[in-house]
Swiss-Prot record:
Functional note: Catalyzes the condensation of carbamoyl phosphate and aspartate to form carbamoyl aspartate and inorganic phosphate, the committed step in the de novo pyrimidine nucleotide biosynthesis pathway.
Organism: Pseudarthrobacter chlorophenolicus (strain ATCC 700700 / DSM 12829 / CIP 107037 / JCM 12360 / KCTC 9906 / NCIMB 13794 / A6) (Arthrobacter chlorophenolicus)
Phylogenetic lineage: Bacteria, Bacillati, Actinomycetota, Actinomycetes, Micrococcales
Enzyme class: transferase
A GO CC term attached to the entry: cytosol
One Pfam family cited in the UniProt record for this chain: OTCace_N
Full protein name: Aspartate carbamoyltransferase catalytic subunit
UniProt keyword list: Pyrimidine biosynthesis, Transferase
GO molecular function, one term: amino acid binding
Amino acid sequence: MKHLLSTQDLSLHNAIRILDTAEEMSAVGDREVKKLPALRGRTVVNLFFEDSTRTRISFEAAAKRLSADVINFAAKGSSVSKGESLKDTAQTLSAMGADAVVIRHWASGAPHRLAATDWIDAGVINAGDGTHEHPTQALLDAFTMRRHWAKLSGTPSEGADLKGMRVAIAGDVLHSRVARSNVWLLRTLGAEVTLVAPPTLLPIGVEKWPCAVSYDLDETLARGVDAVMMLRVQGERMNASFFPSTREYSRRWGFDDNRLRALDSLGMKDTIIMHPGPMNRGLEISAAAADSPRSTVLAQVRNGVSVRMAALYLLLSGDTRETAAPPVLAAAGTAHSTKESI
């Protein structure tokens, strides 16, 4: 594939291909030497115009496990803070021979802009743009759900979709790029998605999204869910009051201890609790819920490296076959020079 900009761009075939490749990549983390020579000699640039810890480190770990060279670029303290444009920055990176650019930007659409221009001849991965999308987060979430879904059914996760899985995504949907990417990807994979939020934290036009909408978390849980994903309340993006108080928000839309107990009383022993991180403990999720056996928070972080390894590998390996993902662990020593669309 040439770029990874949006989950809306992914067909069912391509989404499963990335997830299946990630399954193979996950085996690398269990080896004594956690490295493959697949991208040796390639340069991956992490171009971050917004602060990030887990996403940047995850991409860095993914690239290094594939033996790529990594350049970390932060806007703070760089020429960008002195007024350098995205175009000038991209052309500078091109002159340095970047093969892939992982970009996080405060402006929605910035990764698409970079990919659509001739400023740089490199693959572009969207690591989060404004409130628009965060495709690799959605992919790692789907990877985590698919493993859980396969475990329950006693079948291999490779090649599987999420048909029939019921997923609730609750919280600050308005400011969440994670919610947007998850809605599109999960529907592509066959899951049934319900967004749960106060009316003030739902975007205009949400009724046109391929999902159901609810204002009541308890009612949604009572109808039955296989996974509930809590979204962080993004206070840094709020310039007005979107709910009466943090206490009221937690009581009505947070996953607190009472709702954790309710899963047991409702007979939902296999329901998992997810969070893309970072968490506001005590606000959208209680400490007990975050640390419970149902929580997949740490699994999501771990799976993120595998998914990002898969994305980088498919972006830079030049593999254009329309069949299932190749046996990466056996063939990872060969990485070609072309970058084509899937």
